[in-house]
From Swiss-Prot:
CC terms in the record's Gene Ontology section: nucleus
Sequence segments annotated as region (Disordered): 1-108
Protein's recorded name: SCAN domain-containing protein 1
Keyword NAD assigned: no
Domain SCAN box: 108-166
Upper lineage: Eukaryota, Metazoa, Chordata, Craniata, Vertebrata
Function text: May regulate transcriptional activity.
Oligomeric form and interacting partners: Interacts with ZNF202.
InterPro entries: SCAN-C2H2_zinc_finger (IPR050916), SCAN_dom (IPR003309), SCAN_sf (IPR038269)
Length: 179
């Protein structure tokens, strides 16, 4: 313990104390031993000296340019936040103003009306759009064909003339894709 007291005094932290080896440990079988004439490669770097324990190694701290070039495909902004399944279920079953459940049309409108300035960065915008699309398209209960059908119908409504769109919307209330 006497050997670790100077390290504690120098660093002020017991976490920086290297683990003590048993006194009977042989140095010839220890792969971490840096013995003269040993043919074994050194497994770990030598322990830093007590005076340099609190000094950061410049090579270990990446510069912003190095970090950007190492991962250019990552979107910028805050890290994604996972949504609890319970909160997801509550959002789907939240009653509307008349006490009924919100329908796919409500979630479609929320998805389409979402704007980037509503989010705190690209990652958060992506997370929110993904959540809104899942609430609208419900991939957990709908087939791929049903989801494609919903997307095609929406695109058709977007390109139809106003009169045809009004007729289609009136008929649309009777049609409901259920899962």
């Amino acid at each position: 313990m006497a050997a670790t007291e100077p390290i504690l005094a120098a660093t002020g932290s017991p976490a920086a104390v290297p683990p003590e080896k048993p006194e009977g440990a042989g140095s010839s079988s220890d792969p971490e031993c840096n013995c003269v004439g040993s043919s074994l490669p050194e497994a770990s770097p030598p322990a830093p000296e007590p005076s340099s324990l609190n000094v950061a190694v410049p090579e270990a701290i990446p510069t912003p340019q190095a970090a950007a070039s190492a991962a250019p495909e990552l979107p910028l902004g805050p890290a994604p936040v996972s949504v609890a399944p319970q909160a997801e279920a509550e959002a789907r079953s939240t009653p509307g103003p008349a006490g009924s459940r919100l329908g796919p049309e409500t979630f479609r409108q929320r998805f389409r009306q979402f704007r980037y300035q509503d989010a705190a960065g690209p990652r958060e915008a992506f997370r929110q759009l993904r959540e809104l699309s899942r609430q609208w398209l419900r991939p957990d209960i709908r087939t791929k064909e049903q989801i494609v059908e919903m997307l095609v119908q929406e695109q058709l409504l977007a390109i139809l003339p106003e009169a045809a769109r009004a007729r289609r919307i009136r008929r649309r209330t009777d049609v409901r894709i259920t899962g």
